[in-house]
C-alpha cells in the first residue's frame, strides 16, 4: 500500500509537468498566430501566376547580367514581365508589375538604373536590389520576388 501511495503523487507530478508543457506550447503557438502579419489586402493586386523560365547568360540579350547592377527586363513572364538583376553577391528577380496597383498597362515597371519606376501617374519607385519602395513610404507592398537559381551560365527563375 505504501508503494502505491508513493507512486500516485509522482504520477500526478509527471502529469502536471506534461500539462504545463502542453499549455506552454499552445501559448507559444497562439502568440505566433496573429492577424497583423504585415500582409495587407492591398498587396493582392498581382495574380500568383506560375513562373518557370531559364535565361542563358551567353545570349546577347542576357549577357549584361554577368556584370553587377545591370538589370534586364524579361517579357511574357509573371504579371508584367520579370526584372532580373545581378547584385554582385547573387541574382534577384522581381515581377515587373507595380504591386501597389491593380494591373494595367501603366503599372508595368520600367528600369531606370537600379530602380524600377511605375508608368502610372503616381510613378512609384522600387529598388532593384531589395524590392523595397524608395520614395513613398506609405506604400505597403514591395516588389513580388521570384526564386533564382544560378547554374553555370544559366539562371532558372521560378516561384
Regions found by a protein language model. Give the residues of each.
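N-terminal pre-ligand scaffold of iron-sulfur
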Residues: 36-113, 124-128, 144-159
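Short cysteine/histidine-rich metal-coordination sites, predominantly Zn2+-binding motifs
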Residues: 112-122, 133-146
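Bacterial Sec-dependent N-terminal signal peptides
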Residues: 9-15, 19-55
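The N-terminal extracellular segments of secreted preproproteins, especially immediately downstream
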Residues: 5, 29-32, 42, 105, ...
